[in-house]
Design a protein with these regions (language model features):
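Conserved lysine of the Walker
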Residues: 92-94
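Post-Walker A alpha-helix
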Residues: 96-98, 102
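Substrate-engagement module of ASCE P-loop NTPases
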Residues: 179-187
Length: 187
């Protein structure tokens, strides 16, 4: 009882010390991960996203680094705000989109990104539009267009990553429809 009476006034200080130690451990874990995965603090810019030797954080292997960017963050002469990625199946398109999304999310959390250099634009929202499970149907196309219309009509800064949307309708038609909507929204 006497020991409890002596230690009672220290309870609040002990709780604060444990809380601070947990926070230090959190930041040390982040630093250890960032060092191990060769991450850098990104430069925060007004618009776009650009990674030099960016790497996907969740592949579980040493990925091939990629240099890619969009918008004003990209290297000079390659600053378009809209890009259409094409290529063979298993060519890395989805992995690239995921890599850009991861970098954007990490940067907006104030964390380092797995890249040699990075410039990340300020965005209010990140939208990932991907093919829903199942086959192509008018309902899937209609639902995607309704979602996309809501996204592009919102004037806040955003990053939109769309993956395999052409699979929801005839080959090529979905990509043309969606690209047309994005270009109209950009105008």
């Amino acid at each position: 009882v006497q020991l409890a009476q002596k230690l009672g006034p220290l309870k609040h200080h002990c709780e604060q010390a444990v809380s601070r130690l947990i926070e230090v451990d959190q930041w040390l874990s982040i630093a250890r991960w960032a060092h191990h995965d060769r991450c850098v603090m990104p430069e925060i810019v007004d618009h776009g996203v650009w990674l030099e030797e960016g790497r996907h954080v969740l592949l579980g292997l040493e990925p091939d680094p990629v240099t890619y960017g969009l918008g004003k963050a990209a290297i000079e002469g390659d600053q378009q705000s809209l890009a259409l990625l094409t290529g063979a199946n298993s060519g890395g398109k989805t992995t690239l989109l995921e890599c850009l999304a991861h970098a954007c999310i990490l940067a907006h959390m104030g964390l380092p990104v797995p890249a040699k250099k990075a410039r990340i634009g300020k965005v209010e929202t990140l939208h990932i539009l991907a093919k829903a499970g199942g086959t192509q149907s008018a309902g899937a196309l209609e639902q995607t267009l309704v979602e996309l219309a809501a996204v592009v009509s919102d004037p806040t800064p955003k990053l939109i990553l769309a993956d395999e949307l052409e699979a929801i309708t005839e080959p090529g038609a979905g990509a043309r429809i969606i690209a047309g909507m994005l270009l109209a929204a950009e105008a």
